[in-house]
Amino acid sequence: ATFTIRNNCPYTIWAAAVPGGGRRLNSGGTWTINVAPGTA
């Protein structure tokens, strides 16, 4: 499965969607995560 995280806020956020860390997303930025089938 593929998930796309988009920052719709007018400011920078830190998206934490994976173990061990996350990613800085500027306003309007996106982050695509590919997850293996069967991942819980």
Swiss-Prot record:
GO biological process: defense response to fungus; killing of cells of another organism
UniProt cross-references to InterPro entries, sorted A to Z: Osmotin/thaumatin-like_sf, Thaumatin
Keyword annotations from UniProtKB, A to Z: Antimicrobial, Disulfide bond, Fungicide, Pathogenesis-related protein, Plant defense
Record family assignment: Belongs to the thaumatin family.
Its job: Has antifungal activity. Inhibits spore germination and mycelia growth in F.solani (IC(50)=67.0 ug/ml), C.gloeosporioides (IC(50)=32.1 ug/ml) and a Neurospora isolate (IC(50)=57.5 ug/ml).
Note: On the 2D-gel the determined pI of isoform 1 is: 8.9, its MW is: 22 kDa. On the 2D-gel the determined pI of isoform 2 is: 9.1, its MW is: 22 kDa.
Protein name as catalogued: Osmotin
Taxonomy of the source species: Eukaryota, Viridiplantae, Streptophyta, Embryophyta, Tracheophyta
